[in-house]
Amino acid sequence: MNLIQQLEKEQFDKLSANKTIPEFGPGDTVIVNVKVVEGDRTRVQAYEGVCIGRSGGGINESFTVRKISYGEGVERVFPILSPMIDSIKVVRRGKVRRAKLYYLRQLRGKSARIVEKQDRQQAAVNE
């Protein structure tokens, strides 16, 4: 392990010690609570959408969330360890076969929906 990797690992451990980051991936619907600064006040704003991809690793890891706001597609990229992220919550798991869901940018309406992932144990209980 070279010096840069060692320093990045130390920084990652230090930054992630006080944060709980849930397991999520592309296709999952997430709510990201973001700290917004307005003048001298800060408030928490919820940003809910579909994770269309994760990129990078370690300190540099980020994820992209896409939502439809007033009929217009809005995408936002969040660094995983950003101090502006208050919390991340996974609402539902999506069943996808791609790591990057950029094709959703061209789809509208029902065709842009993602099927919910069913766990094997959960499916066995339901039957």
UniProtKB/Swiss-Prot annotation:
Family membership: Belongs to the bacterial ribosomal protein bL19 family.
InterPro entries: Ribosomal_bL19 (IPR001857), Ribosomal_bL19_CS (IPR018257), Ribosomal_bL19_sf (IPR038657), Translation_prot_SH3-like_sf (IPR008991)
Keyword Cell membrane appears in the UniProt entry: no
Molecular-function annotations in GO: structural constituent of ribosome
Pfam families on file: Ribosomal_L19 (PF01245)
Segments passing through the bilayer: none
Organism: Bradyrhizobium sp. (strain BTAi1 / ATCC BAA-1182)
SUPFAM superfamilies per record: Translation proteins SH3-like domain (SSF50104)
Top-level division of the source organism's lineage: Bacteria
Listed name of the protein: Large ribosomal subunit protein bL19
Keyword tags: Ribonucleoprotein, Ribosomal protein
Lineage: Bacteria, Pseudomonadati, Pseudomonadota, Alphaproteobacteria, Hyphomicrobiales
GO annotation, cellular component aspect: cytosolic large ribosomal subunit
UniProt key word Protein transport: no
Stated role: This protein is located at the 30S-50S ribosomal subunit interface and may play a role in the structure and function of the aminoacyl-tRNA binding site.
